[in-house]
Amino acid sequence: MRVGVLGAKGKVGATMVSAVESAADLTLSAEVDAGDPLSTLTETNTEAVIDFTHPDVVMGNLEFLIDNGIHAVVGTTGFTAERVEQVQSWLAKKPSTAVLIAPNFAIGAVLSMHFAKQAAPFFDSAEIIELHHPQKADAPSGTATRTAKLIAEAREGLAPNPDATSTSLPGARGADVDGIPVHAVRLAGLVAHQEVLFGTQGETLTIRHDSLDRTSFVPGVLLAVRRVRERPGLTIGIEPLLNLQ
């Protein structure tokens, strides 16, 4: 398969360029970065694209890719419900084209989200702390937002988090994502980390994942690239590829 990388000169993008070049069954057809024309992808007969760019440009990228029938594996975050709906609208006009958007491609991170969903109904309280490098554009992270939504779904019908806080500084209790407090840390020296904290009478449970290097995303991205065209339309997350449902 001929694979292009968008955001090829970024830290994650450069890692993906190396990963595709090292994969015997994939051919690196294009390296596209800010200022480069997207037409490079069609001129090089690119079949699938890995996008690690920026929330400000990812929608324009996807519109071009879908219009040209190029499959997309997207690690760029910042996807609101409205953005997802727009992508689905574009895909409806190109039913054979596939887009996979994942908040995280690290296998351990995906498993930690799965474990959090399993644990959620058994605890009274749940909060999330996500920690990333200071260059990250969005907060909270896509992974934390997705984790919070999964926890909220698993706790549907149960009592909300107990919290007697009546006075606080703005933001002191974190962002409220479907009733789950999410706290974002941006600190030099970090890559990507998340703690999910659960508590109930007499015990707590912490589920933590650490990406210590951007190569942690490679196995999940390559899995998605190799299988994306098997799933026309929109897929959210790599859980279906790992049989985690």
UniProtKB/Swiss-Prot annotation:
Subcellular location: Cytoplasm
InterPro entries, per the entry: DapB_C (IPR022663), DapB_N (IPR000846), DapB_N_CS (IPR022664), DHDPR_bac (IPR023940), NAD(P)-bd_dom_sf (IPR036291)
Keyword NADP: yes
Positions of (S)-2,3,4,5-tetrahydrodipicolinate binding: 133, 142-143
Annotated Gene3D superfamilies: Dihydrodipicolinate Reductase, domain 2, NAD(P)-binding Rossmann-like Domain
Record-linked SUPFAM superfamilies: Glyceraldehyde-3-phosphate dehydrogenase-like, C-terminal domain, NAD(P)-binding Rossmann-fold domains
Active-site positions on this chain: 132, 136
GO biological process: diaminopimelate biosynthetic process; lysine biosynthetic process via diaminopimelate
GO cellular component, one term: cytosol
EC number(s) given by UniProt: 1.17.1.8
Organism superkingdom: Bacteria
Role played: Catalyzes the conversion of 4-hydroxy-tetrahydrodipicolinate (HTPA) to tetrahydrodipicolinate.
UniProt cross-references to PANTHER family, sorted A to Z: 4-HYDROXY-TETRAHYDRODIPICOLINATE REDUCTASE 1, CHLOROPLASTIC-RELATED (PTHR20836:SF0), DIHYDRODIPICOLINATE REDUCTASE (PTHR20836)
HAMAP family associated with the record: DapB (MF_00102)
Protein name: 4-hydroxy-tetrahydrodipicolinate reductase
